[in-house]
Amino acid sequence: MSDLLHEKMDYNFLDSILKVIKETPQHKYQILTKRPQRMRKYFLKNEIPKNVWLGTTIESNKVKSRIDLIRDLDTSVKWISCEPLISDLGELDLSGIDWVITVGESGVNARPMKEEWALNIQKQCKKQNVAFFFKQWGAWGSDGIKRNKKENGALLKGKIYHAYPKEKKKIVI
């Protein structure tokens, strides 16, 4: 996985990728970035293919403002990836957002995700009618023990949350 909107990524390269995306309408493409300001700049000037879902990463409360940069983009699905979730996000305005994925951090230096952080997001998604997908705990389990991420699983309070968004039909005039 890479960030197609990274500062070192040339917009001409993105043009060539989007050409292929347009030629393969049978597939759905998720474009995720930590640089939604670049995403916004590009897609306010360029067509967003119908089979593209645009998203941004929100790993901590410090970067919540990224949501505002994708909220009004004309795409069939706008989504947020809280991966890795490393702090409580507090109150979220999910208006205009269709899907939120929450994931704990993996790897040797992984930081723990607290259950209440994930539950806070899940409850807000439910309240605001946004699809919620809890992918996995990562290296730290809900019990605060570090182990293999597969052992920690993907249950949140004993439930699997694997909701997907409904795509909005784009109106072509």
Language-model segments: residues:
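Auxiliary Fe-S-binding modules of radical SAM enzymes
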Residues: I86, E91-I173
